[in-house]
Every structure is written in C-alpha cells, then in structure tokens.
C-alpha cells in the first residue's frame, strides 16, 4: 500500500457488530479526520443468535454471508473503506459460546493455532503500518472464545510484527470505567418504562468494565456526528442488535446504554502526556494530536 496517511489505526475484532458497539465513535472520528482505519474481523459470526423473526431462518454459512453484508453497511455508516476478514472469508468459523460443542469444531477460531493466525495479521500490519492497535483484554471483554482468541492473535501479531521491523507504537484494550456505566444504568432504569424493551441488563453484563483509574484514554462523541454514525452502524447489524437510542439490546433482550464516549487502557507504548488522553495517537512521533490530554 502506497501513499499512506500520517495516522493509521488497526482494530481487531471477533465478529461483525463488535466493532460498532465498542469502537463506532472512534472509527468514525478517525476516518473523518483522514486517518487510515483498518478493521480486521476474525469470523463472520455464523453461530450468532438472530433477533428479527423475518431473518430467523438464517444460520451457518447463510447467516455468515448475511452478516458480512451487515458489516459492509456498518462500515459505510462509519466512513471506513478498509475492512477485512482474517485470512479471507471462511478461514475461521465462529466458535460459539464457551462450553458448547461448537468449540471443538477444528475450523473454528477457538481451535486456531495462534501463531499461524497471528502471521496472517502480521501481513496486514506490514501492509498498512498502523501506529495504533485496538483489541480486547485477555478475557475478551466477557469470556467469549472468539474474543479471547482475537486478543491472543492481536497481541501475538504485535510481537511478531515488531520482530519483523514493523513495530506498533501503541496497543490499547477496549475498556469501560465503572462509574460511567453505573451512571448510565441508573438513567436506563429511570427510562425503561418508556422504552420498547422490558428488562435492563446490569453492569456485570457490559464487557471490559474496570475501575476508573485503569482508563488511560477516552474518545468523546456525545452530540456529534460520530455518535450518530455509531448508532447507524449498530442498526446495520440488524440480525444482532435492536437500537432505540440511546439504548440497545442484543439477542438476550436486555437493554443497555449506547456509550458515545469510548474508553481504552493503554497496555503498550508511551502515554501522550498527563491525565487521560483524548487521542489514540497522542505522543506518537510523526503524527499530530487533535487534542490535549485531560485530567
């Protein structure tokens, strides 16, 4: 790839929809600012539960193909042109929830050799030369096998890429500060009677919640076009998500807030100043900051 923009962001996710829920504001912001945003999705989510009755017939490869189309629609909403499947379509299958027999499928991501899968991601890193990599924490946010493997693959790829002379300057994990999500759920409980959802999720249902002091970086989107783009991207994943702003449900039908500020923990690289960063590229030589770190 030639003529790369000055800022290059790589995100690694397990299934279509994970990127929009976790990073929709972030992706929309950096795409709009002219950064090169690359999304690598590890599986097509063929074993996901389908919400709309009209699409309930979809399963397996048919569901995977449909979700690939949803992903393309979501990327259009976010303004992202570079989105790929790890190893190409069908290379790795959805593993299903932990403890199911699906985990034993030799073609699923859970059974993948991490070094072999990471080598495929290194090829992407060598091509796009990202300064920033975003993925999950070691538990994958909430313990799904594909999320755990996506974390392992991304972190191993960062190591291998550095050994190959293509280091990634900063690596972040998706996080949510406990105080923020507690406040959001308090508002949700007040709003629930007026919503098309019967029950609310709890703080324990939100992936990646940590104590506030673990948060190093926040990307704000309240009241911006980036927040609107995130909601539109989430709506595009209609088999998996029902949106009633500022809330949504997954197939468990438990309402939770759409987070229009997205939070991160820097786990590799140098922090860009004191206090919380508000730019993933803060402090990286050869890029420009769009804001100062805040307390």
Swiss-Prot record:
Organism, scientific name: Streptomyces coelicolor (strain ATCC BAA-471 / A3(2) / M145)
Region forming the signal peptide: none
Cofactors: Zn(2+)
Catalytic activity: 1D-myo-inositol 2-acetamido-2-deoxy-alpha-D-glucopyranoside + H2O = 1D-myo-inositol 2-amino-2-deoxy-alpha-D-glucopyranoside + acetate
Regions annotated as coiled coil: none
Family matches, as Gene3D superfamilies: LmbE-like
One BP term from GO: mycothiol biosynthetic process
The protein's name: 1D-myo-inositol 2-acetamido-2-deoxy-alpha-D-glucopyranoside deacetylase
Expression induction or repression: Gradually induced by thiol-oxidant diamide, under (probably indirect) control of SigR.
Keywords linked to the UniProt accession: Hydrolase, Metal-binding, Zinc
Gene designation per UniProt: mshB
PANTHER family: 1D-MYO-INOSITOL 2-ACETAMIDO-2-DEOXY-ALPHA-D-GLUCOPYRANOSIDE DEACETYLASE, N-ACETYLGLUCOSAMINYL-PHOSPHATIDYLINOSITOL DE-N-ACETYLASE-RELATED
Binding site for Zn(2+): 15, 18, 147
Function description: Catalyzes the deacetylation of 1D-myo-inositol 2-acetamido-2-deoxy-alpha-D-glucopyranoside (GlcNAc-Ins) in the mycothiol biosynthesis pathway.
Cofactor stoichiometry and binding remark: Binds 1 zinc ion per subunit.
Enzyme class: hydrolase
Domain of life: Bacteria
Molecular function GO labels: hydrolase activity, acting on carbon-nitrogen (but not peptide) bonds, in linear amides; N-acetylglucosaminylinositol deacetylase activity; zinc ion binding
The keyword Cell cycle belongs to this UniProt entry's keyword annotation: no
Family: Belongs to the MshB deacetylase family.
EC number per UniProt: 3.5.1.103
């Amino acid at each position: 790839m030639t003529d790369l923009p000055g800022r290059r962001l790589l995100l690694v996710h397990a299934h279509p929809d994970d990127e929009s829920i976790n990073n929709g504001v972030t992706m929309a912001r950096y795409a709009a600012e002219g950064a090169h945003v690359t999304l690598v999705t590890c599986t097509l989510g063929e074993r996901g539960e389908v919400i709309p009755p009209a699409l309930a017939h979809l399963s397996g490869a048919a569901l995977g193909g449909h979700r690939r189309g949803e992903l393309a629609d979501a990327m259009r909403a976010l303004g992202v042109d570079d989105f790929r499947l790890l190893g190409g379509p069908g290379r790795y299958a959805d593993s299903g929830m932990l403890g199911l027999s699906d985990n034993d499928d030799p073609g699923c991501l859970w059974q993948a050799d991490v070094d072999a899968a990471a080598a495929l991601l290194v090829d992407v890193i060598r091509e796009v030369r990202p300064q920033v990599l975003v993925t999950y924490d070691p538990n994958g946010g909430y313990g799904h096998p594909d999320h755990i493997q996506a974390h392992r693959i991304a972190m191993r790829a960062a190591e291998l890429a550095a050994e190959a002379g293509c280091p990634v300057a900063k690596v972040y994990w998706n996080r949510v500060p406990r105080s923020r999500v507690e406040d959001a759920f308090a508002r949700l409980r007040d709003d629930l009677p007026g919503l098309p959802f019967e029950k609310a999720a709890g703080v324990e249902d939100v992936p990646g919640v940590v104590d506030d002091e673990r948060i190093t970086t926040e990307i704000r989107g309240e009241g911006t076009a980036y927040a609107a783009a995130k909601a539109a991207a989430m709506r595009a994943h209609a088999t998996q998500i029902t949106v009633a702003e500022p809330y949504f449900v997954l197939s468990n039908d438990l309402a939770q807030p759409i987070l229009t500020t997205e939070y991160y923990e820097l786990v590799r690289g140098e922090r860009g100043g004191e206090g919380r960063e508000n730019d993933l590229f803060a402090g990286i030589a050869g890029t420009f900051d769009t804001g100062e770190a805040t307390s």
